[in-house]
Curated annotation (Swiss-Prot):
It comes from Clostridium botulinum (strain Kyoto / Type A2). NCBIfam families: sfsA. PANTHER family: SUGAR FERMENTATION STIMULATION PROTEIN A (PTHR30545:SF2). GO terms for molecular function: DNA binding. This is Sugar fermentation stimulation protein homolog. HAMAP family: SfsA. Belongs to the SfsA family. InterPro entries: SfsA, SfsA_C, SfsA_N.
Length: 230
């Protein structure tokens, strides 16, 4: 997907809280919004190059969103709104192999008391619920989720097991917001409960998927499946 708004580079200075950061643009210090509540501490390093998206919204306190950062030569998208958009585009273009037969794609749908990112249906009425998780944590080709404890994420995984137990399809797709990685694994050290929930989900028949992305400064799209170690 193309990012149609104005894109520019800046130098990262600091991040005083989850939602705000300070960057340097043409020698001027500017406060920007960070659309990711994760820690991203391996990416947002003082002096590193980051990518900003200009919002031009008079009702905002900040003019820019900090949407990506360079880790060496590797560009990593950190915008938490991007994964669902990328996966939606991929579903509409039948790029996810095991989900190609699902032609009716609905976003943000509930099942019982649970809300999932996607509800998919085949022409024969078969239903599949899909949850998407964005991944930004990478170390020497190994990617992990989460980068901070996530009770909400664990709850989603357990809810997918419930969907599967009721006879419907269920899956979680980890969208790795960078390119050229080797493997994905749950971050057991950061959140043991999430890792255990994911292992149980796999045992119960929930599909566990991981894809990396082609990331450029003004675009991002689904790329290739990534091997998973649970």
């Amino acid at each position: 997907m193309k990012i149609t708004k104005n894109i520019l580079k800046a130098e990262f200075i600091k991040r005083p809280n989850r939602f705000q950061a300070y960057v340097k643009i043409n020698e001027k210090i500017e406060m920007v919004h960070v659309p990711n509540t994760g820690r991203c501490k391996e990416i947002l390093i003082p002096g590193s190059t980051v990518i900003l998206r200009e919002e031009n919204n008079e009702n905002r306190k900040t003019r820019y969103d900090l949407i990506a950062g360079y880790k060496g030569d590797m560009l990593i998208s950190i915008d938490s709104q991007i994964p669902n958009k990328v996966v939606y585009e991929a579903l509409m273009n039948f790029k996810i192999e095991i989900l190609k037969e699902y032609t009716n794609i609905k976003r943000e749908k509930t099942f019982g008391k649970s809300r999932f990112d996607f509800k998919l249906e085949k022409e024969n009425g078969e239903v599949y619920y899909l949850e998407v998780k964005g991944v930004t944590l990478e170390n020497d080709g190994l990617t992990m989720f989460p980068d901070a404890p996530t009770e909400r994420g664990t709850k989603h995984i357990l809810e997918l097991i419930d969907v599967k137990n009721k006879g419907m399809g269920a899956g979680v797709l980890f969208l790795i917001q960078l390119n050229g990685v080797k493997k994905f694994t749950p971050n057991h050290k950061m959140d043991k409960n999430f890792g255990e929930a994911l292992r149980l989900a796999k045992e119960k028949g929930v599909d566990i998927l991981a894809y990396d992305c082609l990331v450029e400064e003004s675009s991002i799209s689904l790329n290739n499946p990534v091997s998973i170690e649970i």
